[in-house]
Amino acid sequence: MSDFNILFEDGEALVIDKPTGLSIDTPRKGGPSLEKRLDELRLGFQRQPQPAHRLDTDTSGCLLLARNPKALKRFNMAFEQRIVGKVYLGILAGIPEVKEGRIELSLSKISSAEKGWRMIPARAGKPSVTDWRVIAEVNGRALVEFRPETGRTHQIRVHAASGIGIPLLGDPVYGDGASGPRTMLHALSLEMPRENKAAITATAPMPADFTALGFGPAPLPAEALAAEARADSVIQTGGPSAIDDQD
């Protein structure tokens, strides 16, 4: 019996709502990890499912697992080919003047004895791309929808701090770390097309620490939010805005 919230399940795939604080791999210094709990997720199948991608320890939300080696290979390929649709929600430690945009940065890994390792923008790094937009503002903080096209390590965290100019609330590496209960990032939804099968689709509910800060209880799906924004524009101006025409 598992206490994980199962968001999607079929013969080859499983999507769980990963809780914050749960590492994918067992940390060197020990502690809770998904790796230690994979047996709970067999759910009657012979093999333990294996994660097809990664989420940071603090990040909550949609995590896809494969139930057999062939499925894992196909899922890994789908992520590499960038055909997996991913939407994240993050709370910024401030409100940006610009409300939406596209961030394109090359990222590289550095390390030091004092600060450990981190990702930084660097010309010699690997390209990374994220579309973003503010969807709510509460008490001097912004709830932002992130749509990453690439999947670099710490991509959204670096893009918030260096691309938007405001780090995620609670981020100990790219922000001050003391402003929130954790790095406030949530993998809201995931969609993976499959040949000869229905797509894998899942949406994770808004976590309690997001709603405690005034964001929630659950956001509208991204498509509904976009339609709502267009409708508001028509009401206010008598026609669609220039930004909407570009979408």
Regions found by a protein language model. Name each.
Residues 1-13, 19-25, 159-247:
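Pseudouridine synthases involved in rRNA/tRNA modification
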Residues 17-18, 64, 90, 132, ...:
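Residue-level signal for inorganic ion chemistry
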Residues 22-37, 74, 92-142, 202, ...:
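Glycine- and acidic-residue-rich catalytic/RNA-contacting loop of pseudouridine synthases
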Residues 30-34, 79-86:
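A short alpha->loop->secondary-structure connector
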Residues 46-81:
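Glycine/acidic-rich beta-strand-loop module
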Residues 54-57, 136-138, 182:
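A short beta-turn/loop motif at secondary-structure boundaries
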Residues 75, 152-160:
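Short beta-strand segments enriched for Tyr within beta-sheet-rich domains
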Residues 93, 146-149:
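A structural micro-motif recognizing beta-strand termini
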